Amino acid sequence: MSTLVTSPGATVAAGATRAPSQWAQRLPIAAVVLALFGWLLWSVSSRQALLLLVGVGLGWGLAAARFGFTTGWRILVEQRDPSGVYGQIILLALLAAVSMPMLAHFPETHAALGPPSISLLVGAFVFGLCMQIADGCGSGTLYKAGLGVPLNMAILPLFALGSFLGSVHLNGWLALGALEPVGLVQSFGATGALLATLAALAVVAVLVGLWSGQRFSLRRMPRRWVWGAVVLALFAALNLLIAGQPWGVVYGFGLWAAKGATALGLFDPTQNAFWSDPGH
């Protein structure tokens, strides 16, 4: 067999098998996605098929840009590096600029409005604490589990269980005290809502800059936070347009667990206030 000399004392067989390229490794995943897209298009609806592609796009944006909501706040607190939080501010600003006009002019789109409540404050604190411990929010846990990270693969079923249990007891939590939901678009119109949102984001950016000592600057930010924000804003807007509701992850986790509990005969959704609602 002929050999090729690559360096003194080192040779490689000319016919040696090369390591598969990244594209070759991704080909089976692409084939599965394409097959699932075709099945949804044929058996379910074009809407669900398109939402599959939107979900793939969101997952790709999160993984390729390593765009983490949990990570952004952690590096701000631990290292006083505001890049991740600034990336999230860019994402929210872009998405607000696209989604608020849609919510105002397309009646088939609906905002995810919930009542400000004691349960919201308690839940936000517990969720924020746990996502730092688990190294991921809902979307982060899902895409890291998809990448094969053992920690997140173990957390995923527990996340689903927790979401399900929270939905089952939702009415009891709301009974602790809640106000009426407030929709900025309904209250101020698309323009007023957008201006209010951008102003609030600007205040957050200023406060973060003062605390970290690094003012907001696109030139100083790592590129992945910028283009990741653009990609996620694009696909989140497409999700709103196609699904008629905002991008949400945690509801899906609870739905998986609810379906599993129902299939095992452990839960009757018709006897629960949340799951018996036609919207759920």
Each predicted region: which residue ranges?
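Membrane-interfacial helix-loop segments of redox and metal-homeostasis proteins
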Residues: 1-280
